Amino acid sequence: MTDLHTDVERYLRYLSVERQLSPITLLNYQRQLEAIIHFASENGLQSWQQCDVTMVRNFAVRSRRKGLGAAGLALRLSALRSFFDWLVSQNELKANPAKGVSAPKAPRHLPKNIDVDDMSRLLDIDINDPLAVRDRAMLEVMYGAGLRLSELVGLDIKHLDLESGEVWVMGKGSKERRLPIGRNAVAWIEHWLDLRDLFGSEDDALFLSKLGKRISARNVQKRFAEWGIKQGLNNHVHPHKLRHSFATHMLESSGDLRGVQELLGHANLSTTQIYTHLDFQHLASVYDAAHPRAKRGK
């Protein structure tokens, strides 16, 4: 085993023992670092001390020429930077040779939104089954508030203020925000809460699976896709498409970009991390005036 391999093995043990990363994450790191080991060996390197920024750039170019996409290259360089940072912390390197090397930005492909008529058709589902009531409530909340999938499945009953028509969500970066959800969503949440105890009452989660546990993201994706087919929509229905539709419809109706951005938990629609700070009353007024389905009761 070369010094290149030895250092990587030490780093992976550190990630496993000290950082307690999951096996899947460890495997991803291992794959990315094996690629740089192979490239470094081909170029005659015996140790990481011989690696410089030129070699890292050449490695990035080679990876792209072999068909690695922009997102994949960004992941690979991120793993490499983290590894070299660790070597610096261990006094094995004086500086991180990958620090100034960045991957080209991956183009953003926003999903096609569902138009208002198709959204009405999607939401007009048969509610004879309690699980259908739950799904209708999830669809209404997802579209009514533009939630991320993780925010939807993470909702607890305590996060609701149905009298005010509001919900608290924990977004990316543990940023909490209060959102209006509209009277349609409130009505369907109340309908679901009347049936929820059929599946279990011990879990704090708002939305439960048929086994009485917090519903999983995969289950939500599956159910939404099934409803899209049942309701005759031409496009595949998935949670992010509802979030995108929320944003599109709100912007078309209001033109208030900053208000919609705040409702989404973004500084802008390209999901940059610069947050604006609008007061909640303004957000509520934007919502009340613009959303095509979920105008709140006063």
UniProtKB/Swiss-Prot annotation:
InterPro entries membership: CB (IPR044068), DNA_brk_join_enz (IPR011010), Integrase-like_cat_sf (IPR013762), Integrase_catalytic (IPR002104), Integrase_recombinase_N (IPR010998), Integrase_SAM-like_N (IPR004107), Recomb_XerC (IPR011931), Tyrosine_recombinase_XerC/XerD (IPR023009)
GO biological process, one term: cell division
Location(s) in or outside the cell: Cytoplasm
Main localisation: cytoplasm
Domain Core-binding (CB): 2-88
Cellular component annotations (GO), alphabetically ordered: cytoplasm
Highest taxon above the source species: Bacteria
Catalytic site: R148, K172, H240, R243, H266, Y275 (o-(3'-phospho-dna)-tyrosine intermediate)
A single MF term (Gene Ontology): tyrosine-based site-specific recombinase activity
Domain Tyr recombinase: 109-288
Activity regulation (UniProt): FtsK may regulate the catalytic switch between XerC and XerD in the heterotetrameric complex during the two steps of the recombination process.
Keywords: Cell cycle, Cell division, Chromosome partition, Cytoplasm, DNA integration, DNA recombination, DNA-binding
Function noted in UniProt: Site-specific tyrosine recombinase, which acts by catalyzing the cutting and rejoining of the recombining DNA molecules. Binds cooperatively to specific DNA consensus sequences that are separated from XerD binding sites by a short central region, forming the heterotetrameric XerC-XerD complex that recombines DNA substrates. The complex is essential to convert dimers of the bacterial chromosome into monomers to permit their segregation at cell division. It also contributes to the segregational stability of plasmids. In the complex XerC specifically exchanges the top DNA strands.
Similarity comment: family membership: Belongs to the 'phage' integrase family. XerC subfamily.
Subunit structure: Forms a cyclic heterotetrameric complex composed of two molecules of XerC and two molecules of XerD, in which XerC interacts with XerD via its C-terminal region, XerD interacts with XerC via its C-terminal region and so on.
Protein's recorded name: Tyrosine recombinase XerC
Source organism (scientific name): Escherichia coli O6:K15:H31 (strain 536 / UPEC)
Gene name tied to this protein: xerC
